[in-house]
């Protein structure tokens, strides 16, 4: 639709984005993440300027982050291991089915494990008390388990009335609520530079989602020495740290995103 609009008004288009890739699906090639200049409909044809995330971190425009993959902690907790091989792709091939994720959660008691991790984060052995803990869950069940188990925890979901959501988030920013579990609604547009702890309590095949969720803690603030990214589902292993992401032009405008030498865009999932 937006391509038709641009063509109708016959204007030049300048795009600004922190995530220059989009999900594309086709019968022949399945699902893949494509660099924005290589998508159809073809709206953007050229990259005129780019900057690497690592450069912005070095210059202080973004906050430093510590990443904590918690794979081994689950084994210590109950002897289980989160296995992505048990997850099945949905019909588009772009993400996992709800049912396969739920079955894996039940197999490893993911709900109890999430409560255990958040309780530890509320009283860390090192690094000082956290300003706020924002938890990203896939389903409402995990978020509800947190509120039942940990006093002072609130839920924000697509069903939360607007005024109630605003009240919860203001209380969170004021330190009156220490933990907010959100179900797919604060991935983008949530402005809280002081936020220092993000818990990724869901698996994803989406680089854009991973980047956006990590981005909730990457905004700098004088009171924040370092943000924590706590990953319970193997996403760090899949995508790497955002500082590892590199935009690279292999020639003739064939841009792609790489992480630690591994190509993430314009390759089949």
Feature map (PLM): residue ranges:
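SF2 helicase motor core recognition
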Residues: 60, 179-199, 215-219
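Post-DEXD/H (motif II) to motif III coupling segment of the RecA-like Helicase ATP-binding lobe
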Residues: 1-67
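Short glycine-/polar-rich loops that comprise or flank the Walker A/P-loop
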Residues: 9-12, 44-46, 62-65, 151-152, ...
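Conserved interdomain linker/interface between the two RecA-like ATPase lobes of SF2 helicase motors
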Residues: 42-134, 253-258
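Conserved segment of the helicase C-terminal RecA-like domain
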Residues: 209, 216-247
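Cys/His-rich short segments
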Residues: 250-269
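Conserved nucleotide-binding/hydrolysis micro-motifs of P-loop NTPases
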Residues: 11, 18-23, 55-58, 71-76, ...
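Conserved helicase ATPase core of P-loop NTP-dependent helicases/translocases
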Residues: 134, 142-146, 151-188
């Amino acid at each position: 639709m937006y391509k038709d609009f641009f063509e109708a008004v016959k204007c030049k288009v300048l795009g600004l984005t922190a995530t220059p890739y989009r999900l594309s699906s086709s019968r022949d090639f399945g699902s893949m993440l494509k660099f924005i200049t290589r998508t159809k409909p073809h709206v953007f044809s050229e990259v005129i300027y780019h900057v690497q995330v690592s450069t912005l971190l070095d210059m202080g425009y973004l906050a430093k982050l510590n990443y904590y993959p918690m794979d081994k902690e689950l084994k210590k907790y109950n002897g289980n291991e989160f296995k992505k091989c048990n997850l099945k792709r949905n019909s588009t091939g772009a993400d996992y089915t709800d049912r396969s994720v739920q079955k894996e959660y039940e197999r490893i008691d993911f709900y109890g494990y999430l409560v255990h991790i958040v309780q530890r984060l509320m009283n860390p052995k090192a690094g000082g008390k956290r300003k706020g803990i924002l938890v990203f869950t896939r389903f409402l069940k995990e978020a509800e388990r947190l509120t039942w188990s940990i006093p002072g925890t609130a839920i924000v979901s697509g069903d939360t009335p607007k005024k109630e959501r605003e009240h919860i988030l203001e209380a969170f920013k004021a330190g009156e609520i220490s933990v907010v579990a959100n179900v797919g609604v604060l991935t983008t547009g949530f402005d809280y530079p002081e936020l220092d702890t993000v818990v990724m309590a869901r698996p994803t095949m989406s680089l854009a989602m991973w980047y956006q969720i990590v981005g909730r803690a990457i905004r700098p603030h004088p009171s924040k020495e370092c943000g924590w990214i706590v990953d319970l589902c193997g996403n760090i292993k899949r995508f790497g740290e955002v500082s590892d992401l590199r935009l690279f032009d292999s020639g003739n405008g064939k841009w792609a995103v790489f992480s630690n030498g591994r190509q993430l865009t314009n390759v089949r999932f």
